[in-house]
Amino acid sequence: MVCLTNTDIKLDRKIFDLAPILAPNLLFSLSRYEANGQVADLPWCTQDTWIALSQPVHESVLLQSAIPLGLPGCENRLSEIFFSAGFRVFNPCLDIKNVHVQSAKSVHKDEKRLFGAYLFIPACRIGDIGKREFSPVPVYLPRYAKQAFRIGYSG
């Protein structure tokens, strides 16, 4: 089990519940919870933790993944890269509640947003993994389509 997470995330021990269902070409991209106990706004496009089985990946994944973490949009871009390489991607954040513990308030500005191919990943439970209604939706987000984040995704 390999876990990549932002440095301001406190991992939930329930993350280990994913170990028995890890499989080749499966990526968990988990939305965070804020310190107040609420899931982050727009959980389908806000992930801070990625989990996969240790495995060889296609070289194109390695080349495309050389993007800086912490930029707005990097999480959906990273998940899309794995999805395009044949990975199934799920966001079981309704069972695993990783908490965002930030020492200083930061504002994500669109000037620093990573535009392009994104993967919107609906929130689900561990038991929902594999169900069609929780499959992610790949989209292309050009710079002029910022309203997609405000409109939301209904699944």
Language model features: what each stretch is:
Residues 2:
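Short aromatic/hydrophobic "clamp" motif used to bind/position activated sugar donors
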Residues 9-84:
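Conserved catalytic core of nucleotide-sugar-dependent glycosyltransferases
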Residues 68-155:
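C-terminal catalytic/acceptor-binding lobe
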